[in-house]
Curated annotation (Swiss-Prot):
GO biological process: amino acid transport
Protein name in UniProt: Nopaline transport system permease protein NocM
Keywords: Cell inner membrane, Cell membrane, Membrane, Plasmid, Transmembrane, Transmembrane helix, Transport
Localization annotation: Cell inner membrane
Function: Component of the nopaline active transport system probably consisting of four subunits: Q, M, P and T. This system is also capable of transporting octopine provided that catabolic functions are induced with nopaline.
Gene field: nocM
CDD domains associated with the record: TM_PBP2 (cd06261)
Top-rank taxon: Bacteria
Its membrane topology: Multi-pass membrane protein
Similarity comment: family membership: Belongs to the binding-protein-dependent transport system permease family. HisMQ subfamily.
Protein backbone atom coordinates (compact mmCIF):
# COMPACT_ATOMS: atom_id res chain seq x y z
CA UNK A 1 0.00 0.00 0.00
CA UNK A 2 1.30 3.43 -0.99
CA UNK A 3 1.13 5.55 2.19
CA UNK A 4 2.53 8.56 0.37
CA UNK A 5 -0.35 8.47 -2.11
CA UNK A 6 -2.84 8.32 0.75
CA UNK A 7 -1.26 11.40 2.32
CA UNK A 8 -1.20 13.27 -1.00
CA UNK A 9 -4.79 12.31 -1.89
CA UNK A 10 -6.28 13.54 1.37
CA UNK A 11 -6.03 17.33 0.76
CA UNK A 12 -7.06 16.85 -2.87
CA UNK A 13 -10.25 15.03 -1.92
CA UNK A 14 -10.99 17.50 0.86
CA UNK A 15 -11.29 20.16 -1.83
CA UNK A 16 -14.38 18.33 -3.13
CA UNK A 17 -16.12 18.16 0.25
CA UNK A 18 -17.92 21.53 -0.21
CA UNK A 19 -19.46 20.19 -3.42
CA UNK A 20 -20.67 17.06 -1.64
CA UNK A 21 -22.12 19.03 1.26
CA UNK A 22 -23.77 21.58 -1.03
CA UNK A 23 -25.45 18.82 -3.03
CA UNK A 24 -26.67 17.17 0.15
CA UNK A 25 -27.85 20.38 1.84
CA UNK A 26 -29.85 21.73 -1.10
CA UNK A 27 -31.39 18.32 -1.81
CA UNK A 28 -32.35 17.76 1.83
CA UNK A 29 -33.82 21.26 2.12
CA UNK A 30 -35.99 20.86 -0.99
CA UNK A 31 -36.84 17.29 -0.05
CA UNK A 32 -38.02 18.27 3.42
CA UNK A 33 -40.22 21.08 2.08
CA UNK A 34 -41.82 18.64 -0.39
CA UNK A 35 -42.13 15.82 2.15
CA UNK A 36 -44.46 17.64 4.55
CA UNK A 37 -47.37 18.10 2.09
CA UNK A 38 -46.77 14.58 0.73
CA UNK A 39 -47.04 13.19 4.27
CA UNK A 40 -50.27 15.12 4.82
CA UNK A 41 -51.61 13.82 1.51
CA UNK A 42 -50.82 10.26 2.62
CA UNK A 43 -52.86 10.88 5.77
CA UNK A 44 -55.74 12.49 3.87
CA UNK A 45 -59.15 10.83 4.05
CA UNK A 46 -59.60 11.66 0.36
CA UNK A 47 -58.67 8.43 -1.41
CA UNK A 48 -57.60 10.19 -4.62
CA UNK A 49 -55.24 12.53 -2.79
CA UNK A 50 -53.89 9.71 -0.63
CA UNK A 51 -53.43 7.43 -3.65
CA UNK A 52 -51.47 10.07 -5.58
CA UNK A 53 -49.06 10.50 -2.68
CA UNK A 54 -48.83 6.75 -2.17
CA UNK A 55 -48.05 6.23 -5.86
CA UNK A 56 -45.24 8.78 -5.78
CA UNK A 57 -43.71 7.30 -2.63
CA UNK A 58 -44.05 3.74 -3.92
CA UNK A 59 -42.36 4.49 -7.26
CA UNK A 60 -39.46 6.36 -5.67
CA UNK A 61 -38.88 3.78 -2.95
CA UNK A 62 -39.13 0.87 -5.37
CA UNK A 63 -36.52 2.07 -7.87
CA UNK A 64 -32.78 2.69 -7.41
CA UNK A 65 -31.66 6.29 -6.98
CA UNK A 66 -29.07 5.79 -9.72
CA UNK A 67 -31.81 4.85 -12.20
CA UNK A 68 -33.84 7.90 -11.17
CA UNK A 69 -30.81 10.13 -11.70
CA UNK A 70 -30.12 8.65 -15.13
CA UNK A 71 -33.76 9.02 -16.18
CA UNK A 72 -33.75 12.70 -15.25
CA UNK A 73 -30.32 13.49 -16.71
CA UNK A 74 -30.46 11.45 -19.91
CA UNK A 75 -34.22 11.06 -20.28
CA UNK A 76 -34.98 14.79 -20.20
CA UNK A 77 -33.35 15.13 -23.63
CA UNK A 78 -36.31 13.19 -25.05
CA UNK A 79 -38.53 16.11 -24.09
CA UNK A 80 -36.18 18.90 -25.11
CA UNK A 81 -38.78 20.62 -27.28
CA UNK A 82 -41.40 20.72 -24.53
CA UNK A 83 -38.87 21.77 -21.90
CA UNK A 84 -37.55 24.53 -24.17
CA UNK A 85 -41.05 25.90 -24.69
CA UNK A 86 -41.60 26.26 -20.95
CA UNK A 87 -38.07 27.57 -20.34
CA UNK A 88 -36.79 24.57 -18.38
CA UNK A 89 -34.35 23.03 -20.82
CA UNK A 90 -31.51 25.29 -19.68
CA UNK A 91 -31.93 23.77 -16.21
CA UNK A 92 -32.37 20.14 -17.22
CA UNK A 93 -29.23 20.15 -19.33
CA UNK A 94 -27.16 21.03 -16.25
CA UNK A 95 -25.81 18.04 -14.24
CA UNK A 96 -26.14 19.98 -10.98
CA UNK A 97 -29.86 20.58 -11.48
CA UNK A 98 -30.51 16.95 -12.43
CA UNK A 99 -28.53 15.60 -9.48
CA UNK A 100 -30.29 17.87 -6.99
CA UNK A 101 -33.70 17.08 -8.49
CA UNK A 102 -33.10 13.33 -8.28
CA UNK A 103 -31.75 13.49 -4.74
CA UNK A 104 -34.53 15.85 -3.59
CA UNK A 105 -37.34 13.73 -5.04
CA UNK A 106 -35.79 10.63 -3.52
CA UNK A 107 -35.35 12.02 -0.03
CA UNK A 108 -38.79 13.66 -0.15
CA UNK A 109 -40.42 10.25 -0.58
CA UNK A 110 -38.53 8.65 2.29
CA UNK A 111 -38.85 11.69 4.55
CA UNK A 112 -42.60 11.89 3.96
CA UNK A 113 -42.96 8.39 5.40
CA UNK A 114 -40.79 9.33 8.36
CA UNK A 115 -42.91 12.43 9.04
CA UNK A 116 -46.13 10.47 8.52
CA UNK A 117 -45.03 8.03 11.18
CA UNK A 118 -44.17 10.91 13.49
CA UNK A 119 -47.60 12.49 13.01
CA UNK A 120 -49.35 9.19 13.66
CA UNK A 121 -47.37 8.80 16.90
CA UNK A 122 -48.95 11.95 18.39
CA UNK A 123 -51.44 10.82 21.01
CA UNK A 124 -55.12 11.55 20.53
CA UNK A 125 -55.24 13.03 24.03
CA UNK A 126 -52.88 15.84 23.06
CA UNK A 127 -54.96 16.65 19.99
CA UNK A 128 -58.18 16.63 22.01
CA UNK A 129 -56.59 18.95 24.58
CA UNK A 130 -55.71 21.39 21.79
CA UNK A 131 -59.29 21.26 20.53
CA UNK A 132 -60.59 21.85 24.04
CA UNK A 133 -58.77 25.18 24.27
CA UNK A 134 -60.23 26.29 20.93
CA UNK A 135 -57.30 25.76 18.58
CA UNK A 136 -58.09 25.58 14.89
CA UNK A 137 -56.96 22.54 12.89
CA UNK A 138 -54.08 24.52 11.38
CA UNK A 139 -53.00 25.83 14.78
CA UNK A 140 -53.18 22.33 16.24
CA UNK A 141 -50.88 21.08 13.53
CA UNK A 142 -48.43 23.99 13.77
CA UNK A 143 -48.14 24.18 17.55
CA UNK A 144 -48.87 20.64 18.75
CA UNK A 145 -48.81 17.91 16.12
CA UNK A 146 -45.89 18.96 13.92
CA UNK A 147 -43.39 19.81 16.71
CA UNK A 148 -44.09 16.49 18.45
CA UNK A 149 -43.91 14.61 15.15
CA UNK A 150 -40.51 16.14 14.37
CA UNK A 151 -39.15 15.10 17.76
CA UNK A 152 -40.40 11.58 17.23
CA UNK A 153 -39.07 11.41 13.67
CA UNK A 154 -35.66 12.97 14.32
CA UNK A 155 -33.65 9.74 14.83
CA UNK A 156 -34.99 8.21 11.61
CA UNK A 157 -34.52 11.48 9.74
CA UNK A 158 -30.92 11.60 10.92
CA UNK A 159 -30.36 8.29 9.17
CA UNK A 160 -31.93 9.71 6.02
CA UNK A 161 -29.60 12.72 6.13
CA UNK A 162 -26.57 10.44 6.33
CA UNK A 163 -27.93 8.28 3.52
CA UNK A 164 -28.32 11.29 1.22
CA UNK A 165 -24.82 12.52 2.02
CA UNK A 166 -23.46 9.14 0.95
CA UNK A 167 -25.79 9.05 -2.05
CA UNK A 168 -24.26 12.24 -3.43
CA UNK A 169 -21.49 9.93 -4.66
CA UNK A 170 -23.88 8.87 -7.43
CA UNK A 171 -23.68 12.39 -8.85
CA UNK A 172 -20.21 11.48 -10.10
CA UNK A 173 -21.91 9.31 -12.74
CA UNK A 174 -23.34 12.43 -14.40
CA UNK A 175 -20.04 14.36 -14.46
CA UNK A 176 -20.26 16.19 -11.11
CA UNK A 177 -16.86 16.27 -9.42
CA UNK A 178 -17.67 15.70 -5.75
CA UNK A 179 -15.59 13.47 -3.45
CA UNK A 180 -16.20 10.24 -5.38
CA UNK A 181 -15.92 11.96 -8.75
CA UNK A 182 -12.57 13.47 -7.82
CA UNK A 183 -11.43 10.12 -6.44
CA UNK A 184 -12.13 8.55 -9.83
CA UNK A 185 -10.05 11.22 -11.53
CA UNK A 186 -7.13 10.61 -9.19
CA UNK A 187 -7.43 6.85 -9.73
CA UNK A 188 -7.36 7.29 -13.51
CA UNK A 189 -4.04 9.12 -13.12
CA UNK A 190 -2.42 6.91 -10.45
CA UNK A 191 -3.99 3.47 -11.09
CA UNK A 192 -4.21 3.01 -7.32
CA UNK A 193 -7.91 2.60 -6.45
CA UNK A 194 -7.44 1.09 -2.99
CA UNK A 195 -5.44 3.96 -1.51
CA UNK A 196 -7.65 6.66 -3.01
CA UNK A 197 -10.92 5.03 -2.00
CA UNK A 198 -9.59 4.51 1.54
CA UNK A 199 -9.19 8.27 1.79
CA UNK A 200 -12.62 8.90 0.23
CA UNK A 201 -14.21 6.41 2.61
CA UNK A 202 -12.53 8.07 5.58
CA UNK A 203 -13.91 11.45 4.52
CA UNK A 204 -17.47 10.09 4.21
CA UNK A 205 -17.03 8.35 7.57
CA UNK A 206 -16.00 11.58 9.26
CA UNK A 207 -18.87 13.57 7.71
CA UNK A 208 -21.49 11.01 8.76
CA UNK A 209 -19.97 10.82 12.24
CA UNK A 210 -20.33 14.59 12.65
CA UNK A 211 -23.91 14.47 11.36
CA UNK A 212 -24.81 11.64 13.75
CA UNK A 213 -23.45 13.65 16.70
CA UNK A 214 -25.40 16.73 15.59
CA UNK A 215 -28.60 14.69 15.33
CA UNK A 216 -27.93 13.24 18.78
CA UNK A 217 -27.45 16.76 20.16
CA UNK A 218 -30.66 17.99 18.49
CA UNK A 219 -32.57 15.01 19.88
CA UNK A 220 -31.24 15.77 23.36
CA UNK A 221 -32.13 19.46 23.04
CA UNK A 222 -35.68 18.85 21.80
CA UNK A 223 -36.53 16.29 24.50
CA UNK A 224 -36.58 17.79 28.02
CA UNK A 225 -36.76 14.36 29.66
CA UNK A 226 -33.43 13.44 28.06
CA UNK A 227 -31.82 16.62 29.42
CA UNK A 228 -33.18 15.89 32.88
CA UNK A 229 -31.88 12.32 32.73
CA UNK A 230 -28.30 13.45 32.16
CA UNK A 231 -28.39 16.27 34.70
CA UNK A 232 -28.82 19.12 32.23
CA UNK A 233 -25.64 18.48 30.26
CA UNK A 234 -25.35 17.15 26.74
CA UNK A 235 -24.53 13.42 26.63
CA UNK A 236 -21.06 12.51 25.53
CA UNK A 237 -22.20 9.60 23.43
CA UNK A 238 -25.37 7.97 22.21
CA UNK A 239 -26.32 5.09 20.03
CA UNK A 240 -26.87 5.74 16.35
CA UNK A 241 -30.51 5.01 15.54
Amino acid sequence: MDIQLIIESFPKLLAAVPTTLTLAFISLLIGFVVSVPVALMRLSKNRIVSSLAYGYVYIIRSTPLLVQMFLIYYGSAQFRGVLSEVGLWSSFREPWFCAILALALNTAAYTSEIIRGGIQSVSLGQIEAARAVGMSTFLQFRRIVFPIAIRQALPAYGNEVMLIIKSTSLASTITIVEVTGLAKQIISATYSPVEVFIVAGAIYLFITFVVSRLVMLAEWWLNPHMRARVGGTAPKAAETH
